[in-house]
Design a protein with these regions (language model features):
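Hydrophobic-face positions in mid-chain alpha helices that act as interaction patches
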Residues: 53-74, 87-88, 177-178, 184-187
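Generic structural "secondary-structure junction" signal
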Residues: 18, 22, 32, 92, ...
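Short coil/linker segments at helix-helix boundaries
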Residues: 154-194
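Membrane-proximal, proline-rich intrinsically disordered regions
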Residues: 14-68, 127
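Sec-dependent bacterial lipoprotein signal peptides
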Residues: 1-13
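Acidic helix-start/capping segments at beta-turn-to-alpha-helix junctions
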Residues: 64-70, 136, 142-143, 165, ...
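Short amphipathic alpha-helical interaction/hinge segments
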Residues: 19, 52, 152-159
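Conserved, well-structured interaction surfaces
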Residues: 82-157
């Protein structure tokens, strides 16, 4: 039995071939392929129309939905009551807060959009990039600036006479917006970003 076990161990084992993952691309693969970097470029405007990004709710249909949310929250749009409305939380300023999906949708959508731009920026080395790739890089920086500007509009705490600028953690958040997460920030650091 011992001899059979030894022969089986030698015959049935072998070297493992290392393969690259096929369900995702590495940073090296993205930066070395012109088609891959072009795909990252087109991912940015495509994300603006992304459907069911966060939770699959009927309001989860991309940037246009965020524009609609801002319109109904700021009385820029007449609200018609039909008894069935996917935007009622924002229209009535109800169920808005850290424990509600309506708030989390906006936050998560913006950060996934930032991640999409950071993927493009991180895939291009400006020192060795072609002229076309530098154009892609410029587009990514533009999209990221656009998203951060929108986040500032949505999340900056402004002085008012109804709500204290001191949050539940005891921090004064007057005139603060959101943390800046660039392509160089690690996931661990991003999760710890004040």
């Amino acid at each position: 039995i011992l001899g059979l076990s030894c022969v089986s161990a030698v015959v049935l084992t072998g070297c493992i071939d290392e393969t690259l993952p096929t369900h995702q691309a590495t940073d090296e693969q993205l930066s070395s392929s012109s088609k891959a970097t072009e795909a990252l470029l087109w991912a940015m405007p495509a994300f603006a129309n992304n459907y069911k990004t966060v939770d699959g709710g009927d309001y989860d249909w991309g940037y246009g939905s965020l524009m609609h949310i801002r319109d109904v929250m700021t009385d820029e749009m007449v609200i018609i009551e039909s008894g069935y409305d996917h935007y009622s939380a924002w229209e009535h300023n109800q169920y808005i807060g850290p424990n509600y999906l309506s708030t989390q949708f906006i936050w998560n959508y913006f950060w996934k959009f930032v991640q999409t731009t950071n993927n493009m920026i991180g895939a291009i080395n400006p020192e060795s990039a072609s002229e076309t790739q530098l154009g892609y890089l410029g587009a990514a920086y533009g999209y990221r600036a656009f998203i951060y500007l929108d986040m500032a509009r949505m999340f900056e705490f402004l002085e008012n006479d109804g709500t204290s600028p001191t949050n539940s953690s005891g921090n004064n958040v007057l005139n603060l917006t959101v943390p800046i997460v660039t392509e160089e920030v690690t996931e661990e650091a991003a999760r710890n970003n004040p």
